[in-house]
Amino acid sequence: MSEIIPEEYKRTVKSALNMLAYADCTANQLEKKLTAKGYSQESIEFAVNYALQRGYLNEKRYLERFIEQLANTKLYGLNRIALEIYKKGFSLALVRDNLGEFVKDIDFEENCIKLAQKNKRSDRNKLYEYLIRAGHTGAHAAKAVKIVLSQADDDEI
């Protein structure tokens, strides 16, 4: 039993699947992209639901990979990760239910130290502020600054 799908719905679904083939995105982002292409709201909702039901659009998987990428590649702290998640448009319920699980294995203190070593600055305050802007806690940033600057002092001797 196949359902009859109007032609506009087919075009919208095809466009959505093409977008998802190139890059993962949230349902919110997909809706915005399809709206920008001029599709009707009804066909956009159909396409998003189609992609969700068939597993082409999996926000939980995307959220997990996005968090891992920000923590492991950019060495962001939890606060900056939360900001980036908000900017991407993930649903609040999804984030609330899964954030703790996805970040439990990430060593933010170690990431903070790595980021401080990667971006050595001679000024203690500038380095500390840089780490805070990267989303690390004050305690982690202070410890990283202390370690990196003590290593720099040891190198000079």
Which residues make up each language-model segment?
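An alpha-helical, amphipathic repeat domain used for nucleic-acid recognition
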Residues: M1-I157
